[in-house]
């Protein structure tokens, strides 16, 4: 434990916070190009085929990004917008692709939580 004099001389040094999404380099989103679009299996006890893409960002860093929602139109060379946010049961996936931006189309037929999936407002009198 330091003395008062030592604290006056040197002071406390704040701990540096480690970023949870370092590839974005402090930006809210980054653009990237899909290198590979594939599926991954989650950790135990979950079971599924989660849709993911290997994306090369504009700063040259390659990351795995999750493709949210049901169905997608992404393929190799698609240009996408990537945000931070990990997928808990997919190790190594620390980013999400933003639906409805650039080449990633919004989710078709989505009625609730539409803004998160880039879905337009459905026409009135459509099917229930």
UniProtKB/Swiss-Prot annotation:
The keyword tRNA-binding applies. This is Small ribosomal subunit protein uS12. Residues 1-29, 106-128 are annotated as: Disordered. The keyword RNA-binding applies. PANTHER family: 30S RIBOSOMAL PROTEIN S12 FAMILY MEMBER. One of its GO terms (cellular component) is small ribosomal subunit. GO terms for biological process: translation. Keywords: Methylation, Ribonucleoprotein, Ribosomal protein, RNA-binding, rRNA-binding, tRNA-binding. It comes from the Bacteria. The gene is rpsL. With S4 and S5 plays an important role in translational accuracy. Part of the 30S ribosomal subunit. Contacts proteins S8 and S17. May interact with IF1 in the 30S initiation complex. NCBIfam families: rpsL_bact. Gene3D superfamilies: Nucleic acid-binding proteins (2.40.50.140). It holds the Pfam family Ribosom_S12_S23. The modification 3-methylthioaspartic acid is found at residue 89. GO terms for molecular function: rRNA binding; structural constituent of ribosome; tRNA binding. InterPro entries: NA-bd_OB-fold, Ribosomal_uS12, Ribosomal_uS12_bac. It comes from Dictyoglomus turgidum (strain DSM 6724 / Z-1310). Belongs to the universal ribosomal protein uS12 family.
């Amino acid at each position: 434990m330091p003395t008062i004099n030592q604290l006056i001389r040197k002071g406390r040094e704040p701990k540096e916070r480690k970023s949870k999404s370092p590839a974005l380099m402090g930006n809210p989103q980054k653009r990237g190009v899909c290198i590979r679009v594939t599926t991954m299996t989650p950790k135990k006890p979950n079971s599924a085929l989660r849709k993911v893409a290997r994306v090369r960002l504009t700063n040259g860093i390659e990351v795995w990004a999750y493709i949210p929602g049901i169905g997608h139109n992404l393929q190799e060379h698609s240009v996408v917008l990537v945000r931070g946010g990990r997928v808990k049961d997919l190790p190594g996936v620390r980013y999400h692709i933003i639906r409805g931006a650039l080449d990633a189309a919004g989710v078709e037929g989505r009625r609730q939580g539409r803004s998160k999936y880039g879905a337009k407002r459905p026409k009135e009198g459509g099917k229930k």
